[in-house]
């Protein structure tokens, strides 16, 4: 129900009643829009508005602007003619275009302020963090995000992206057509999620440090430490586990990433790392290298050894794992295939 008694304070000149102001706003909207809105008034309110409209004095443009501004302020604050601001919004949407409703309720200014805050917040992160997360996005999305950033910051982010992808992204940025508001909002919502993820990772410095330490250890030592940590705090252990990558985790790496990684590792290191490994790990590694290199390594592994130098094996395995972490941090490979890991855990 309309509550005219709460609709603002008297304006300068001959004071207007609340019904006068309502009549003025409706008349200013025009016949088409006003006609659609009138059905939402009670019979008593309609009688008051009609009576006021018949005797309404001439209202100067500046005074009318004040009335409309007053009307806008009331709805922007969520109060006014009706108790339910959402109901008022739905009333306006029936009679006005989306642009007119946005303008009336001050949404456009609010959205622009929100939009600006997104890009300001993104700039607060390190370029390396931003680049790392952007690599998961479609190249066109990356191009749009870079186009929205200041040139100096955008250039730093671009340099964190692998060189083979930069040309494509720059080309997309140069040839980018105007993005529709709907598409822009979808991307900007993704940017908000991106910011939240970046901030969460920045705040997880402790778990990252612990994982870095564990990544320097052998698997039995890591398993023991994780078990002890889980006894103390399951939450802490769950934060650390995803950041640990050991030689045995090669089994959970996507095939394409595994091929890229092992292509960077020498045959001597791989041979040493595979000594004493399970059949599954051996096949996982050997199936990801060239046939020629596989034959060489299999030939070396077939030569019997008097004793297994566990220290050298551990060093070789750590070298492979550290190279994997380095490539993953630069965005060149993915460490774990979640589906494969879950399947292994369920087995």
Swiss-Prot record:
It is a peripheral membrane protein. GO terms for cellular component: bacterial-type flagellum basal body; plasma membrane. GO terms for molecular function: cytoskeletal motor activity. One of its GO terms (biological process) is chemotaxis. The keyword Disulfide bond does not apply. Disulfide bonds: none annotated. It is found in: Cell inner membrane; Bacterial flagellum basal body. The record marks 172 as: Part of the EHPQR-motif. A motif (Part of the EHPQR-motif) lies at residues 137-140. It comes from the Bacteria. Keywords: Bacterial flagellum, Cell inner membrane, Cell membrane, Chemotaxis, Flagellar rotation, Membrane. InterPro entries: Flg_Motor_Flig, Flg_Motor_Flig_C, FliG_a-hlx, FliG_M, FliG_N. Belongs to the FliG family. PANTHER family: FLAGELLAR MOTOR SWITCH PROTEIN FLIG (PTHR30534:SF0). FliG is one of three proteins (FliG, FliN, FliM) that forms the rotor-mounted switch complex (C ring), located at the base of the basal body. This complex interacts with the CheY and CheZ chemotaxis proteins, in addition to contacting components of the motor that determine the direction of flagellar rotation. This is Flagellar motor switch protein FliG. It comes from Agrobacterium fabrum (strain C58 / ATCC 33970) (Agrobacterium tumefaciens (strain C58)). The lineage of its organism: Bacteria, Pseudomonadati, Pseudomonadota, Alphaproteobacteria, Hyphomicrobiales. The gene is fliG.
């Amino acid at each position: 129900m309309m509550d005219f008694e709460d609709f603002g304070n008297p304006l300068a000149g001959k004071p207007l009643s609340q019904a006068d102001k309502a009549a003025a706003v409706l008349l200013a909207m025009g016949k088409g829009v006003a006609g659609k809105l009138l059905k939402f008034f009670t019979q008593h309110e309609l009688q008051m508005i009609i009576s006021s409209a018949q005797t309404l004095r001439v209202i100067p443009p500046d005074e009318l602007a004040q009335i409309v501004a007053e009307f806008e302020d009331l709805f922007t604050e969520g109060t006014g003619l009706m108790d339910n601001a959402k109901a008022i919004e739905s009333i306006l949407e029936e009679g006005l275009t989306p642009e007119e409703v946005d303008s009336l309720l001050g949404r456009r200014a609010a959205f622009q302020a929100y939009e600006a805050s997104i890009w300001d917040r993104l700039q607060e992160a390190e370029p390396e963090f931003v680049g790392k997360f952007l690599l998961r996005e479609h190249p066109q999305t990356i191009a749009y995000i870079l186009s929205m950033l200041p040139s100096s910051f955008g250039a730093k982010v671009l340099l964190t992206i692998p060189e083979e992808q930069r040309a494509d992204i720059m080309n997309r940025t140069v040839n980018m057509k105007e993005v529709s508001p709907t598409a822009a909002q979808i991307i900007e919502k993704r940017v908000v999620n991106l910011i939240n993820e970046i901030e969460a990772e920045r705040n997880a410095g402790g778990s990252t440090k612990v994982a870095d330490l564990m990544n320097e250890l052998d698997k039995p030592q890591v398993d023991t430490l994780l078990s002890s940590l889980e006894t103390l705090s399951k939450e802490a252990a769950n934060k650390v586990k995803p950041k640990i990558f050991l030689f045995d985790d090669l089994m959970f790496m996507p095939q394409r990433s595994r091929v890229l990684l092992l292509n960077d590792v020498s045959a001597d290191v791989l041979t040493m790392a595979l000594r004493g490994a399970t059949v599954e790990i051996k096949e996982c590694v050997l199936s990801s290298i060239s046939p020629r290199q596989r034959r060489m390594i299999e030939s070396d592994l077939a030569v019997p050894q008097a004793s297994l130098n566990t220290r050298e094996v551990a060093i070789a395995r750590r070298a492979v794992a550290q190279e994997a972490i380095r490539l993953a941090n630069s965005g060149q490979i993915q460490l774990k295939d979640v589906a494969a890991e879950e399947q292994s855990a369920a087995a």
